[in-house]
Amino acid sequence: MELGAAARAWSLLWLLLPLLGLVGASGPRTLVLLDNLNLRETHSLFFRSLKDRGFVLTFKTADDPSLSLIKYGEFLYDNLIVFSPSVEDFGGNINVETISTFIDGGGSVLVAASSDIGDPLRELGSECGIEFDEEKTAVIDHHNYDVSDLAQHTLIVADTENLLKAPTIVGKSSLNPILFRGVGMVADPDNPLVLDILTGSSTSYSFFPDKPITQYPHAVGKNTLLIAGLQARNNARVIFSGSLDFFSDAFFNSAVQKATPGSQRYPQTGNYELAVALSRWVFKEEGVLRVGPVSHHRVGEKAPPNAYTVTDLVEYSIVIEQLSEGRWVPFDGDDIQLEFVRIDPFVRTFLKRKGGKYSVQFKFPDVYGVFQFKVDYNRLGYTHLYSSTQVSVRPLQHTQYERFIPSAYPYYASAFSMMVGLFIFSVVFLHMKEKEKSD
């Protein structure tokens, strides 16, 4: 009986091993919320690009009563895609507060809206420093619309010059013009974390396309955001697109040409390339940095001392890596600075790349106390990189001071001259004999 039970246990273990291997090999868990499941077919190219990169997609309607992002204090997914602009209430235990908590926990969120936008997406945008225009409004441009739009001029042809100058976010390859049809956004001017990824042209504005303009539009000119992004202080990333059609197969495969006479016709839009680049950035496949080993020591030594001494000549080195194609590779940057800080920086210098690490040699200031080697690297499109190493710097010991200090030579001269003068005066005073007066 015992041998039979052991055999069954081993058989069960061998059956479970492939399943465990599949679980271990699974990619980032991504929840996709849709207005309806037909969007899986109309936006199949975008979802296929995610699957080809190893993402595990879970499709659900936005009002599904079984929806859940957090269970027992743990996040069930790594990423969230919201392709349900018209949702009025999320299902299950998902709401704007839950999504905000997900972002605060470091989760990545991709949101696509449209002219039929509901209150939940509007509230989520407000939480992230983005304000959507009213429902049923659209971005209108009477000078930069596609030739196929002969009515309301809401099918916008966005030039690549209006893209954010950040290859890490929008990609490094040149793009064809972008097709856009959707709602406009404006950024909170008091929120420095918002990124204007794609803006409208100077002739664009956001209003009701079927009504005459009776008041100043919500967004005008370059202030009209078509695609916006956010990188929070905890490196969580969010992207808002005012157009759900931007990610559709129809827009990916469509030809594009401005309606202005003499404009060039392109056989395909740049939507697919831009959408892939944005998804790579927001889901942290691009622009992710990390700190590797950090070392510091006196020049000529290999290990750090218990305490440094003022005016020591030291060497500091740090390894910085970048995530590329799923692997950590050395980061290539020429603007990384090191600060040697007590309260304020006493030394600020550039780090030079040597092999797979960045290093620099410098001399400590003639000030003692508790200092920090600090690298604080914050660049557009990259995660915030921070490294701090605390060290003690003591004054010189009595035996370490110079015998004679050059700057004190005048005082030495005055002291010795006083001694010589006193000696001469004493000799003269003691040996001088007054002449006797004669009668």
Swiss-Prot record:
Q: In which pathway does it act?
A: Protein modification; protein glycosylation
A Pfam family for this UniProt protein? OST48_N
Please verify whether the record's keywords include Transmembrane helix: yes
The residue ranges for the Lumenal side of the membrane come to: 27-410
Report membrane topology. Single-pass type I membrane protein
Q: Which residues form a coiled coil?
A: none
A GO cellular component term found in this entry reads: oligosaccharyltransferase complex
Q: What is its main location?
A: endoplasmic reticulum
List keywords of the entry alphabetically. Endoplasmic reticulum, Membrane, Signal, Transmembrane, Transmembrane helix
A Gene Ontology biological process in which this protein takes part is: protein glycosylation
Q: Where does it live in the cell? A: Endoplasmic reticulum membrane
- Stretches of the chain found on the membrane's Cytoplasmic side: 431-439
Q: Which residues cross the membrane?
A: 411-430
Signal peptide span:
1-25
> Whom does it interact with, and what assembly results?
Component of the oligosaccharyltransferase (OST) complex. OST exists in two different complex forms which contain common core subunits RPN1, RPN2, OST48, OST4, DAD1 and TMEM258, either STT3A or STT3B as catalytic subunits, and form-specific accessory subunits. STT3A complex assembly occurs through the formation of 3 subcomplexes. Subcomplex 1 contains RPN1 and TMEM258, subcomplex 2 contains the STT3A-specific subunits STT3A, DC2/OSTC, and KCP2 as well as the core subunit OST4, and subcomplex 3 contains RPN2, DAD1, and OST48.
Q: What family does the Swiss-Prot or TrEMBL record give for this protein?
A: Belongs to the DDOST 48 kDa subunit family.
Q: What does this protein do?
A: Subunit of the oligosaccharyl transferase (OST) complex that catalyzes the initial transfer of a defined glycan (Glc(3)Man(9)GlcNAc(2) in eukaryotes) from the lipid carrier dolichol-pyrophosphate to an asparagine residue within an Asn-X-Ser/Thr consensus motif in nascent polypeptide chains, the first step in protein N-glycosylation. N-glycosylation occurs cotranslationally and the complex associates with the Sec61 complex at the channel-forming translocon complex that mediates protein translocation across the endoplasmic reticulum (ER). All subunits are required for a maximal enzyme activity.
Q: What is this protein called?
A: Dolichyl-diphosphooligosaccharide--protein glycosyltransferase 48 kDa subunit
